[in-house]
Structure formats: structure tokens, C-alpha cells
């Protein structure tokens, strides 16, 4: 068996996230189904992703790996996969890698983007969160506090099996492109729903639904199951995953 590393894009609007579910369509489920079809294999061919994106979340550079036996060249395998996948999921690159490679555990950085639209647009309803006009300077002051090694327990959905809730954030900034306000964040790892909690909380501060002091306390005094603000999934995009 050869181990393959793939990068893929998907529009998350019609997926119940990345991870296999007992019912409903997932990205992992679609990929495994297509691999079984191409190989005429009845047993499961597990696909492991770098980031387990939630329902409605998109990816421009998700990375995954799987073990597969085929006589097809890499180019032929991409064509076979994309020919059987639905149009909202595309394999962009494929390569054979070392048997020890792991898409999730070998990743050293992940880069996410969250898109907000200051206004109403039917075209962006599945790609951005519609918000009122905002102060970019204040937003970037809030974002800058996230850079560094912090415990993000307050900004995550708590799971007991997690060994720790610390993440190292290398980049955290907002940019403006016309009416599109985009949050860029790069870190070594991210907790469940973390980016959406961060965005929702920063917007809540801007809209005076939460004080700057309370935002700072959430970061400096981490606690689980805080009632906090969460941005909707459709604005979130996994941009790329970095390996050594």
C-alpha cells in the first residue's frame, strides 16, 4: 500500500462537516466512498484530515492522507477522484509520501480566514457573516492580544479528552477589502469552534455587547463553558496547512 497526501477544496454549505457521521453527508465520507468505488473494495479505506471542519465550514487548502493500492499515475488518480466526487469538493494536488506521514499530527501551522460582510448580499450568504459597519482599528487591537502562547479554554467547546487547551498564535489580524472584512489567524493548533468564538466575541465587543475588560479576562482567566458569542460557520475557511 502507498500513502497518498492530497490537498482539497470544498464548499461546506451542503456538508455536515469533515468527520464521518452515522447519518448525513460529510467530506470524509464522500472521499472514502469514492476511494472504495475506484478500487472496487468493500472494506473501508480511512481518510485522515488535517482539520476537522464543522458543518457549513469551507476549505481552500485542507490536507488529508490515505493508504491506497493502484496502478493509476498521480494525474490519473486525481482525474478518477474528481470524476466521481460532487462538484462542491475537488482534489487539487496529490503525491505519494512516506508511510509515517500524518496529515493531522505532522501539521505545524494552520491558517484560517473568517469573512464578514458589512451590508446585505445574497451572493455571500454562504460565504460570509453579515455585520454592521465596524471600526477596523479597534478590531485589530482586540486581534493583536491573541498573538502568542495562550490558554484558549474560554474560546472553545470543552472536551474532557483534551490534554490541554493552549495554542500558539503566530498571526491574528483583520483586513478590509471593499465591504468584506476578513479575519486572518495562523496557529499551531485550534480548539473546537475556537475561531468562531474569537470572531463572535470580537464583534460583540465592537457592538458594545461585551466590554473590553471582559474580553481581556476571558483570555487571561481561562474557564470552561463560558456563555460566549459564536460567529456562524459559513464565514469560516481553512486556507492552508503547513508542514515542516
Regions found by a protein language model. Give the residues of each.
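Structured-RNA-binding interfaces characteristic of tRNA pseudouridine synthases
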Residues: 1-244
Amino acid at each position: 500500500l502507498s500513502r497518498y497526501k492530497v490537498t482539497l477544496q470544498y464548499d461546506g454549505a451542503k456538508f455536515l462537516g469533515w468527520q464521518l457521521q452515522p447519518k448525513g453527508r460529510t467530506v470524509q465520507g464522500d472521499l472514502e466512498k469514492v476511494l472504495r468505488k475506484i478500487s472496487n473494495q468493500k472494506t473501508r479505506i480511512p481518510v485522515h484530515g488535517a482539520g476537522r471542519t464543522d458543518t457549513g465550514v469551507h476549505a481552500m487548502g485542507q490536507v488529508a492522507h490515505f493508504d491506497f493500492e493502484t496502478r493509476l499515475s498521480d494525474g490519473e488518480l486525481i482525474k478518477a477522484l474528481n470524476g466521481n466526487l460532487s462538484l462542491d469538493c475537488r482534489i487539487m494536488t496529490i503525491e505519494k509520501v512516506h508511510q509515517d506521514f500524518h496529515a493531522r499530527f505532522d501539521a505545524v501551522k494552520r491558517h484560517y480566514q473568517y469573512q464578514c460582510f458589512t451590508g446585505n448580499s445574497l451572493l455571500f450568504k454562504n460565504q460570509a457573516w453579515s455585520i454592521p459597519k465596524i471600526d477596523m482599528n479597534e478590531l485589530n487591537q482586540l486581534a493583536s492580544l491573541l498573538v502568542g502562547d495562550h490558554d484558549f479554554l474560554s474560546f472553545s467547546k470543552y472536551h474532557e479528552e483534551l490534554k490541554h487547551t493552549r495554542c500558539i498564535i503566530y498571526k491574528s489580524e483583520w483586513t478590509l477589502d471593499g465591504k468584506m472584512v476578513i479575519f486572518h489567524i495562523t496557529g499551531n493548533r485550534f480548539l473546537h469552534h475556537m475561531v468562531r468564538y474569537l470572531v463572535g466575541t470580537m464583534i460583540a465587543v465592537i457592538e458594545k455587547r461585551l466590554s473590553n475588560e471582559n474580553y481581556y479576562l476571558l483570555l487571561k482567566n481561562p474557564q470552561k463553558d463560558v456563555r460566549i458569542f459564536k460567529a456562524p460557520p459559513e464565514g469560516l475557511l481553512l486556507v492552508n496547512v503547513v508542514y515542516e
